[in-house]
Amino acid sequence: MRHAAYGKPHRGSYNRGAHAPNTGTGTMINGELIDLVAGDYEARIASSGAMLVHLRRQGRDLIMPFDAQATLPAGWQGKTLLPWANRIAGSRYDYAGTEFLVGCNEPASGSALHGLAGWMDWQVADDDPSGADDGAPRSRVVLELSLLASYGYPWSLEASACFELDAERGLSVTVTATNVGAARPAPPVPGAPEVKGEPAPAPYGVSCHPYLTRSVPLDDCVLTIPAAEVLDVDEHMAPTSLRSVEGTDWDWRGGRLVGATQTDNAYTALPEGTWEVSLRGGQGNRAVVMSSDVPWVQAYTADELSRPGVAIEPMTCPPNAFNSGEDLIALKVGQSHSFTYRLHEED
């Protein structure tokens, strides 16, 4: 079993072979912890789920942190989510004429939530491409995962997540996945459907799950989401219809006080190119800003967690895309897809 040291960030700070502090369990809860530093920014990454544990600037939290040495994250915080984003309604999907069943991990809705990679142990792929040999802090790390084919998802993916911290730009994260093979069906054992004698491309979506936070309650912050449409959901959190945000509680385009408003919805009709979502408030009235260029973003006011922040989840596709096909990515064997998001603080 590998253990990690969690002292002051330094070259190779995950220190394979060192022992973690005694948490009462004798186990390494969230895998290896890697600390990054650049200018006034510092970040911690955990290998479990290629997870962003904390991100700070001058000591101020930009995302909701947690004690990764002793506890599990609440509400998927900071996880890298693939090969689907959000929910598969009913934990089943039809693809290329074949029905697949996936594990339900949200009993209240009956859904398969947030993909397959969020609790897997990703591997550190580089020893320190950024730090100097004199022990300077590292500012970049790459984690890799081999996601093998399974009954519910009979495609194998090679995935990587590159976390890079910059003194001016903050944190940039790029997640790349490549389809490296598909299992052929051998009844009664399921496999990838065949299209014209070849395995169907792998259905794919990707997202992330940081909770933006400020030093004041969420109710006292100003949230800006430049989306013109919102996706309604039913009692099982399955999508029902897309509608304009105009005149609703979900119109955040001009930036407004969160107050008591609750949302756990996907938003779209975002500006072309790179868009920004921001949460402003607290010390110096600064904003934490999430930017990406994907067509969807989920906003969740974390009401079940007593509203410590708002989850902003850029998504390549909407909830239940494995059934609807909307904005679903199809990766042929050998094809890759990359997704990037950035987090920084704005004065």
Across the structure, where does each feature detected by a protein language model lie?
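Intrinsically disordered, low-complexity terminal tails and inter-domain linkers enriched
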Residues: 5-25, 129-136, 181-200, 232
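Short, Gly/Pro- and small/polar-rich lid/capping loops
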Residues: 24-39
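Acidic/His-leaning functional-site neighborhoods
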Residues: 41, 111-126, 251-324
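Acidic-aromatic substrate-binding/catalytic surfaces of carbohydrate-active enzymes
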Residues: 42-101, 105
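Acidic, contiguous internal or C-terminal segments within carbohydrate-active enzymes
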Residues: 43, 145-187, 193-204, 208-215
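Short Pro-Gly-centered flexible turn/kink motifs
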Residues: 93-102, 175, 330-346
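Extended, loop-rich substrate-binding clefts of extracytoplasmic carbohydrate-active enzymes
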Residues: 103-167
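Active-site/ligand-binding surface loops and adjacent short beta/alpha elements
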Residues: 183-185, 189-190, 194-203, 210-292
